């Protein structure tokens, strides 16, 4: 197979990934592949572009490094072109409502007839099967959080709150990426393709597991946090200093001992409630939990963030300032690791945003292209799989494909 024009880089160079999906979750999976060197083809509707394009800046990050194909994959010759593309594809990712592709005749079995080694990742809110009530429902970030038990655990004591920005979308997209790579590893061993059913609510169920396990195995439900503090453990979570906010984790025997000396609670060490060797102070079960919070709040409020960070570094207590977005760019760690970078958009502008992560030492990722326009690479992709200029024009004339104007 000849690949589309692009630089060769990253651990996934030579891999062809195709995705069909809008907004965040499914495309985020494709984005990870693209930043790690795979050739990634983004399928868009012919008549209506991906709704993400209405955003002014985010698409330049979320659709960089992609090849844009505008094709009606469910109808007539458009479907034929899509299936021909699948013959040269390693991984196909689709994000839709339940078994939408199967309902329209593109089943796993049809895809495997054209490519027995194909890895297929289906990403939906509620999965490919289940009850009629849920399976075909639309889902976004907040829907998956609400249905999974994740949302109810977040917020404050007075009200639950979703975790933003769009946590379920990103977790689900990354799950699709890792699952597809796991499947590809097995396919290369057996020669037999795989189909993956990723339900967003199940991803968030797994991500929300920490406190749920106490309920499933004892009936105890953890309360929601209060003012950003850990619902279980004192000295953990969000705290206010004299000039801003920090997060901290008071964990460890010596850390607790030394911190208690600073905040005037050394006399509690070695008591039945806080015996020697205590590594965590339970906010509820320990009768001194509220007192620890009161003393810690007072001590932190009397010190600046810089003073707290310096002292906690001496005590080996993990803490960090809560950075504002304007502070990120100039932070020395960000600068040293080039965590924020710039790249050129297709129309020649400069765009600034997060760099590629993680950092591969021997085969690093690369930003080689900004977001392509709607249908920008349709002709090149169709030619790559054997279509002539006349074939392409016929698809366009029938409204089954769109090429760049």
Swiss-Prot record:
Q: According to its UniProt record, which protein family does this protein belong to?
A: Belongs to the CoA-transferase III family. CaiB subfamily.
Q: Name one GO biological process term.
A: carnitine metabolic process
Q: Does the keyword Membrane apply?
A: no
User: Any idea what this protein is called?
Assistant: L-carnitine CoA-transferase
Q: What keywords sit in the KW lines?
A: Cytoplasm, Transferase
Provide the active-site residues from the annotation.
169
Q: Which residues bind CoA?
A: 97, 104
Q: Which gene encodes it?
A: caiB
Q: Does the keyword Transferase apply?
A: yes
Q: How does it assemble?
A: Homodimer.
Reactions catalysed, semicolon-separated, are: crotonobetainyl-CoA + (R)-carnitine = crotonobetaine + (R)-carnitinyl-CoA; 4-(trimethylamino)butanoyl-CoA + (R)-carnitine = (R)-carnitinyl-CoA + 4-(trimethylamino)butanoate
Source organism of the structure? Escherichia coli (strain 55989 / EAEC)
Molecular function GO labels: L-carnitine CoA-transferase activity
Give a short account of what the protein does.
Catalyzes the reversible transfer of the CoA moiety from gamma-butyrobetainyl-CoA to L-carnitine to generate L-carnitinyl-CoA and gamma-butyrobetaine. Is also able to catalyze the reversible transfer of the CoA moiety from gamma-butyrobetainyl-CoA or L-carnitinyl-CoA to crotonobetaine to generate crotonobetainyl-CoA.
Pfam families (alphabetical)? CoA_transf_3
- Organism lineage: Bacteria, Pseudomonadati, Pseudomonadota, Gammaproteobacteria, Enterobacterales
Protein localization: Cytoplasm
> EC number(s)?
2.8.3.21
- Tell me the SUPFAM superfamilies matching this sequence: CoA-transferase family III (CaiB/BaiF)
This protein's pathway reads: Amine and polyamine metabolism; carnitine metabolism
- GO cellular-component term (any): cytoplasm
Q: What is this enzyme's class at the first EC digit?
A: transferase
The UniProt entry, under InterPro entries, shows: CoA-transferase_III, CoA-Trfase_CaiB, CoA-Trfase_fam_III, CoA-Trfase_III_dom3_sf, CoA-Trfase_III_dom_1_sf
């Amino acid at each position: 197979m000849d690949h589309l024009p692009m630089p060769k880089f990253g651990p996934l160079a030579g891999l062809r990934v195709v995705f069909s999906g809008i907004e965040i979750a499914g495309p985020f999976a494709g984005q990870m592949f693209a930043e790690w060197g795979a050739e990634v083809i983004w399928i868009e509707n012919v008549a209506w572009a991906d709704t993400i394009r209405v955003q002014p800046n985010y698409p330049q990050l979320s659709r960089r490094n992609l090849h844009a194909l505008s094709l009606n994959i469910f109808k007539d010759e458009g479907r034929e072109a899509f299936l021909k593309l699948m013959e040269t594809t390693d991984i196909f990712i689709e994000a839709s409502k339940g078994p939408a592709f199967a309902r329209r005749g593109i089943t796993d079995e049809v895809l495997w007839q054209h490519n027995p080694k194909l890895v297929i990742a289906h990403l939906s809110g509620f999965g490919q099967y289940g009850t009629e009530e849920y399976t075909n429902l639309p889902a976004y970030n907040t829907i998956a959080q609400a249905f999974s038990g994740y949302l109810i655990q977040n917020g404050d004591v007075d009200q639950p709150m979703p975790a933003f920005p769009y946590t379920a979308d990103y977790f689900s997209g990354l799950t699709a990426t890792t699952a597809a790579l796991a499947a590809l590893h097995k396919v290369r061993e057996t020669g037999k393709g795989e189909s993956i059913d990723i339900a967003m609510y199940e991803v968030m169920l797994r991500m929300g597991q920490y406190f749920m396990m106490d309920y499933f195995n004892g009936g105890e439900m953890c309360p929601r946090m209060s003012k950003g503090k850990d619902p279980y453990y004192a000295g953990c979570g969000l705290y206010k200093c004299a000039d801003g906010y920090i997060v901290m984790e008071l964990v460890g025997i010596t850390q607790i001992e030394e911190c208690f000396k600073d905040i005037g609670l050394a006399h509690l060490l070695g008591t039945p409630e806080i015996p020697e060797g205590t590594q965590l102070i339970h906010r509820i079960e320990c009768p001194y939990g509220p007192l620890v919070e009161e003393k810690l709040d007072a001590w932190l409020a009397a010190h600046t963030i810089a003073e707290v960070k310096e002292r906690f570094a001496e005590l080996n207590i993990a803490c960090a300032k809560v950075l504002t977005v304007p502070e990120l760019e100039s932070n020395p760690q960000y600068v040293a690791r080039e965590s924020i970078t710039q790249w050129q958009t297709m129309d020649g502008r400069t765009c600034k945003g997060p760099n590629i992560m993680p950092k591969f030492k021997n085969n690093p990722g690369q930003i080689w292209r900004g977001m392509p326009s709607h249908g920008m690479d349709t002709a090149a992709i169709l030619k790559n799989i054997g279509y002539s200029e006349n074939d392409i024009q016929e698809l366009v004339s029938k409204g089954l494909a769109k090429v760049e104007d």
